[in-house]
């Protein structure tokens, strides 16, 4: 497992934009599973929507992307200092949102490698709440120098 303190050593994101709390499974160049606990105190619920809080789909995608970023960094053949690199997401295809995510939910991310060539990555991403699919997308990324 990779806790949030270790995640912050891999990814440049910080509160309020660090959207993965823990990595619970990681098989290099294959799959990563992580999650974010969704809380009513998350700043986004002040405006989305005050009387009907729904976690925004674009933040679900960003959480998936960050989870995939951990997998990409941890899968690099030549281990580099993550502080000198950054993962840029270059494309999102076939994004679908199946069910709303609400405060109190645990949002589980699952990112599988579809293709990897050098610093280029294609992931199949899925997000679940209580085992039910809430979102899915294909995400494309590349690792570049800062």
From Swiss-Prot:
SUPFAM superfamilies: Thioesterase/thiol ester dehydrase-isomerase. Keywords: Cytoplasm, Lipid A biosynthesis, Lipid biosynthesis, Lipid metabolism, Lyase. GO terms for cellular component: cytoplasm; membrane. The keyword Lipid biosynthesis applies. It comes from the Bacteria. One of its GO terms (biological process) is lipid A biosynthetic process. Its EC number is 4.2.1.59. GO terms for molecular function: (3R)-hydroxyacyl-[acyl-carrier-protein] dehydratase activity. The keyword Cytoplasm applies. It holds the Pfam family FabA. Gene3D superfamilies: Hotdog Thioesterase. The active site is at 48. It is found in: Cytoplasm. Its main location: cytoplasm. This is 3-hydroxyacyl-[acyl-carrier-protein] dehydratase FabZ. It comes from Campylobacter lari (strain RM2100 / D67 / ATCC BAA-1060). The gene is fabZ.
């Amino acid at each position: 497992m990779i806790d949030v303190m270790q995640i912050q050593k891999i990814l440049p994101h910080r509160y309020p934009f660090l959207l993965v709390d823990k990595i619970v499974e990681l098989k290099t160049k294959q799959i990563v599973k992580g999650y974010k606990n969704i809380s009513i105190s998350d700043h986004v619920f002040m405006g989305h929507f005050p009387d009907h809080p729904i976690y925004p789909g674009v933040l679900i995608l960003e959480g998936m992307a960050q989870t995939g970023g951990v997998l990409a960094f941890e899968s690099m053949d030549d281990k580099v200092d993550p502080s000198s690199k950054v993962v840029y997401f270059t494309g999102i295809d076939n994004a679908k949102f199946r069910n709303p995510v609400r405060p109190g939910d645990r949002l589980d991310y699952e990112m599988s490698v579809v293709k990897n060539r050098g610093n280029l990555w294609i992931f199949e991403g899925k997000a679940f709440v209580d085992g039910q699919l809430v979102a899915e997308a294909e995400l494309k990324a590349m690792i570049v120098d800062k």
